[in-house]
């Protein structure tokens, strides 16, 4: 049984992809475990619509009372504001789980000097582990590396005794809405798709798109490379998230690079629509992890590798691609990486 009462403390300003992932996962779990009860502050601007708000949202005062009685509180990082004060006022750190979706931003996560500064504790800006939350919260889930204190890490005393408080890898996952247009028996009619909102950070986005376009033109593949935009705050292209989900559902091979961190929602949108994926080196888990060991994932370290993988996957589309053959692995991916996993 999963008869827990869970309060989700959302960011104070704007929405957050990571928080959306948590809310979607809880709503999916509730379908399987009706005894599960979760609530969040109704002012949070999630993308799930009015019915979701009516079912799970609470006015601020009511949410405070719910949180007092909750078994678990999930405190979500917010780029523009994290509500640490809410937990402090309740004096509820002993039942608070911190989910850290922070990222360094732009393409700075590629910089080895900055990586070293994070390990040494010199860098304390956006994207660095929150040492205070490590000490206060029984569990700390984190979207981006590092997941441990490193060679300079402090030890913290907990109810379990003296031990090094590590962080649990918790990347974004496959949300239920990503698969809204996917139909298992429907034939896909787009060979390659490379859709990005902006192409400056990292520039790999621009170059992989251009290489994909040239490759498809040369080899007669159907290609989609229109830019996407995110509503309601940022507009950079003609395709909204809703439209992009429809495109992924029609796509055989998706192109992915890192975003403002190693992780990106695009990676999970592509996998969620039963596509093959050519992805920049996946660095979400520890080096010996097999969490993403799937045949459909073709990785590249540089543009030379990317071109090689384009040729390899293109040949597979010509001679060996059968959509039905992907279904068994697709179900395993959903089992391990959907938001309810």
Cite the ranges covered by each PLM segment.
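Nucleotide-sugar donor-binding catalytic core of glycosyltransferases
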Residues: 2-268, 272, 276-294, 339-340
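Alpha-helical elements of Rossmann-like donor-binding domains used by nucleotide-donor carbohydrate transfer enzymes
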Residues: 21, 25, 211, 308-312, ...
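Conserved aromatic
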Residues: 93, 300-303, 336
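Residues within well-ordered alpha-helical secondary structure of globular protein domains
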Residues: 250, 312-315, 335
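A short acidic/histidine/glycine-rich donor-binding loop in glycosyltransferase catalytic cores
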Residues: 293-301
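C-terminal "capping" alpha-helix adjacent to the active site of nucleotide-linked donor transferases
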Residues: 301-321
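A charged, aromatic-enriched C-terminal amphipathic alpha-helix characteristic of glycosyltransferases
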Residues: 317-341
